[in-house]
Amino acid sequence: AGGELVRFTTQGSREAENMKNINAGIRADGYQTPLVADVHFNPNVADVAALYCEKVRVNPGNYVDPARKFIKQEYTDEEYAHELQKIEDRFVPFLNICKEHHTAIRIGVNHGSLSDRIRNRYGDTPEGIVESCLEFLRICKKENFHDVVISIKSSNTVVMVRSMRLLVEEMEKEGMNYPLHLGVTEAGEGEDGRIKSAVGIGALLADGIGDTVRVSLSEEPAAEIPVARHLVDYIGKKKGHLLIPAAACPSFDWLRPTRRETVAVGNIGGNNVPVVISNRINGESTICENKDATPDYIYIGGKMPKQFVPGQSYIVDYNVYETLNSKPETTGAKLYPIFPAMAMPLIASIKADVKFLTLQFGTPAEEYIACLKAHPEVVVICVSNHQNRLGDQRALVHEMMNAGLKNPV
């Protein structure tokens, strides 16, 4: 199927011992794919698996700490330190086995299996997830064991992304630089599972975070590989792109991003939910049979559609806006002009409650900033033909934030 690692769930000692036979069997068949044993609850199983696999995954939430029972218990600092020492006393012998057999490990934290100890001190939070991981990483660093990969997984993509970003920041503070494994737990099946995986994994890959990827679908394992490959290939196409000379807005919090403050222009921006614009400049019908799939706005360029739908909002090129707006066929429909950057001087000459302006990062900043400050009724359509389109679009938004602009994008 194209996977570069194969993970086996290893429930007990019998399964761990059988990894020896599995390893020998696939090597005899000529396969050199590394094997990963996924171990929960029993550190003794991890010890055995480390003898026969290239990597062993352990879960900090249940490696030494008992399975969580949602018991509330306050720990003094002394008691908490004692619990950490218990982890170290058990984890170090495992690291020694891994050193002897050149076995890598993955410290894999699951949002759903944080220990009661962590939850009682940090809550069910990204901070608790990250601390659960760092407790084990600090031992690895202390023991000079660096064949480590880290994963933080959750079925909640917001928690997953924020936790992984926070982990990267905390590792930098502590002088750590371990590779990161990305995945969304139980993403689901079909289109929903693929979208959820893309949201979580794709957001982090776009940040430059992530070294290995696993897509978790409720389907046959082989179906997961093409999805993961597509995500990796998509990001790989941006490799070596031209520098984007941008300056991040100082008020932007990378770990806790909030919605950018904007003014309301019609039903766009302010406290409104994001709108959907459909591009139909090639003459596609603007009539939607499925009312639930009707876009908020339809862009038709400079062409007359076969029929204007009463009540529907249309975006039309600025140079035909006044002509189309005066035609009887448009009665009942709502038309709004869109301007390219080169037509900014004409924005003031056309009357409309909502106007659209296409901008790309690199447009002379002084020119468009002055225009947008003078015309709060303008909504920016952020476009890009850069190899790293997302980075280019982020750069424009940060440039606007640095200028204090509140026009919707």
Where are these predicted regions, by residue range?
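N-terminal active-site wall of soluble small-molecule enzyme domains
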Residues: 10-52, 284-286, 307-308, 321-331, ...
